[in-house]
Amino acid sequence: MKNYLNFEQDIKNLEIELDKLKDPYNQEGLSEVDTGRISKIQSEIDGKLNDVYSNLDSWQKTQVARHEDRPKAKFFIENLFEEFIPLSGDRFYGEDKSVLAGFAKFNQTSVLVIGQEKGEDLDSRIERNFGMMRPEGYRKTIRLMKLADKFNIPIILFIDTPGAYPGVGAEERGQAEAIAKSIECCMELKVPTISVIIGEGGSGGAIALASSNKVLMFENARSEERRVGKECRSRW
């Protein structure tokens, strides 16, 4: 089921009407009037989309960046790469499922792919911790980036996170140190690196994987810095 934002209500109504006209049970009975109506509604939808999305304010752009239906890292990995081999664990503490990482082929070239993954439904979002990486996630990516650097393999990273996970356990396991080490690792790599912000690029949680040679950004994606002092104090 498609999800709509509050400012997309007119588009939603038009698409519901269009779906009714395109109902397969009605196809045999479609008249020239119906087909003309379908074309007209589709044109109205296109016009509404253009009007709405060319005049978004800052909060609306943030909502679009966080949209439930926005393609996630998993989607791009499955559709852009071949022979993806996922790798897990940081060899210190455990696995962090909020980040996908592994080696793959891109245009017949071996690459390391890393993607912050929010999940596609409630269960997977909980499993992926809503894309908020823990220290073991950053240490996993550091391990793999160093491995790619050793074998001269380029690195492609997909950024989509509201920020690093601010929980007590993450802080106890060295969240700040893990982020700093990840930034340091990215800056020291000798292989080409490209980071693509596909949704949210929140704070140090994003910068830890976005310190690349090239940083690209999707339309209506967001990248921001925030002060987390009060958030940290509230945990202790």
Descriptions of predicted regions:
Residues 225-232, 236:
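Conserved small/polar residues in nucleotide/adenosyl-binding loops
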Residues 1-207, 211-225:
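Terminal-region recognition feature
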